[in-house]
Amino acid sequence: MNGKFEGFIKLAGKFISILQGRKKVLGLFDKKTQKEQEDYFDHVWNTRRFRYMFKILFNKKMLAKRGLVADYFTFDDGSKSFADSFYNRSRKAFRDIPIQSNYFTSLYLLGKYNSLNVVPAYLKEENFETIKSRVDRIKIFTNEAQKWIDTIPDHTIDCFALSNICELMSEKETHSLFSSVIRTAKDDARIIFRNLMIPREVPEDLRNSIKKDEPLSKKLFDTDRSFVYGKVAAYTVQKNGNK
């Protein structure tokens, strides 16, 4: 978590831990069933002080101090403010997503992984040899996405993970990026991208080639263990447009 926003979320996690107290935080991670977790959130965790904390942390002045500008944010989740939106997202993470398997929440609240068995797949011991044998396949490029993708030959990529990079792009820049995705993608290539606060979608005139998988998108969003994103969406590139 090294970016400005990631650093802010890390700070918010520390603040929540102090506010709730270590005993209450550990109590959340002790819940073994979903019903126990839901009841704990409803009757122990979700205090007036906890809810008010979001108004303190997630406001324009506080965000500006952390180098984040909130003026461009809009909401497509029914929230009236930045604070309301992030309260709703935290509620989902702490109440509805199984806490025992959520290593993101563990990092946010405990500052560490709570169990060696509940870590990202790349950190699991059983995957070490596979990763070690294939590490030469990893290539790191530091550049703007559009400049990088312009160097890639046609029909060569089978997966795109675009995070939320479109949020600060203009409509023209977004259209250019997704046009390049179509050009460089193999047929049936998969795409995943996210929205933090600004609603973004594949440009309408490209949707015949980039088709959204609505059921998979809903499943990914409903089970997303990182609560900060307001949208998780999956797509398939279909170059003939008629599958």
Model-derived features: positions:
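Class I S-adenosyl-L-methionine-dependent methyltransferase module
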Residues: 1-133
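A short acidic, Gly/Pro-enriched loop at the edge of an enzyme's catalytic core
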Residues: 143-159
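Flexible loop/turn segments at secondary-structure boundaries
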Residues: 147-150, 167-170, 199-203, 227-230
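A short SAM/SAH-binding and catalytic strip from SAM-dependent methyltransferases
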Residues: 157-172
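A short glycine-rich, Lys/Arg-flanked "PGG" loop and its adjoining helix->strand segment in the class I
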Residues: 173-187
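Conserved beta-strand signature within the Rossmann-like core of class I S-adenosyl-L-methionine
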Residues: 187-199
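Core SAM-dependent methyltransferase catalytic element
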Residues: 214-243
